[in-house]
C-alpha cells in the first residue's frame, strides 16, 4: 500500500466527473487500499478517488473513533434522502478551512463493496453527511460550492496565503 497525493483546491482536476467502475478487480482493490492508507495518513474521515486524481466512482470512509470501521462505496447511488442538518465541514482538498453546509439528515444508498458485492445502506448523523460530501466529489462538487461567492473568495484567499507560506517553509 502507498500514500497517494491529495489534490488541493483550486486544482481543476477536482472538478472532473468520475466514471463508473467497470469491474471490481485487483487493481480497484489496490486503489481502495491506497485510498484508506492516504485517508488515515491525512487524518481524514472520508476520501473520494477524485481527490487523489483517480477519476472513478470510489469512496472510502471511516468515521469511527478507533479507525476500525472501514466502509467502501464503489459506484454509489443515492436512493433516498430525508430531513435537514448541517455541520461545519472540512475537506482534505481544502486544508484548514471549514464551513457550515446544508445536508440531508438521513440517506439510503446502494453501492458495491471492495469485493464487488452490491449492498444497500441507511445512514444518519456524521456518516450520512460524510457520504454526501464524498459523493459530491464524484461529480466535481466541493463543499465550498454551497457557500456564497463572498465566502468562497475569502476561502480562496486564505488558501493562497497558506500555500505561499508552505512554499516558503
Curated annotation (Swiss-Prot):
It holds the Pfam family Pep_deformylase. The active site is at residue 134. Keywords: Hydrolase, Iron, Metal-binding, Protein biosynthesis. Its EC number is 3.5.1.88. GO terms for molecular function: metal ion binding; peptide deformylase activity. Its cofactor is Fe(2+). GO terms for biological process: co-translational protein modification; translation. Binds 1 Fe(2+) ion. Fe cation binds at residues 91, 133, 137. It catalyses: N-terminal N-formyl-L-methionyl-[peptide] + H2O = N-terminal L-methionyl-[peptide] + formate. PANTHER family: PEPTIDE DEFORMYLASE. Removes the formyl group from the N-terminal Met of newly synthesized proteins. Requires at least a dipeptide for an efficient rate of reaction. N-terminal L-methionine is a prerequisite for activity but the enzyme has broad specificity at other positions. This is Peptide deformylase. The gene is def.
Amino acid at each position: 500500500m502507498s500514500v497517494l497525493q491529495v489534490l488541493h483546491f483550486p486544482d481543476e482536476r477536482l472538478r472532473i466527473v468520475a466514471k463508473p467502475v467497470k469491474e471490481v478487480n485487483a487493481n480497484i482493490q489496490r486503489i481502495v487500499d491506497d485510498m484508506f492508507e492516504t485517508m488515515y495518513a491525512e487524518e481524514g474521515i472520508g476520501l473520494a478517488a477524485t481527490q487523489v486524481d483517480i477519476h472513478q466512482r470510489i469512496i472510502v470512509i471511516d468515521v469511527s473513533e478507533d479507525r476500525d470501521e472501514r466502509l467502501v462505496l464503489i459506484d454509489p447511488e443515492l436512493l433516498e434522502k430525508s430531513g435537514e442538518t448541517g455541520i461545519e465541514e472540512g475537506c482534505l482538498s481544502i486544508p484548514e478551512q471549514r464551513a457550515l453546509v446544508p445536508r440531508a439528515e438521513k440517506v439510503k444508498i446502494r453501492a458495491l463493496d471492495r469485493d464487488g458485492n452490491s449492498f444497500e445502506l441507511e445512514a444518519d448523523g456524521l456518516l450520512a453527511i460524510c457520504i454526501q460530501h464524498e459523493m459530491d466529489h464524484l461529480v466535481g462538487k466541493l463543499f465550498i460550492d454551497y457557500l456564497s461567492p463572498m465566502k468562497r473568495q475569502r476561502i480562496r484567499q486564505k488558501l493562497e496565503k497558506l500555500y505561499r507560506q508552505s512554499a516558503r517553509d
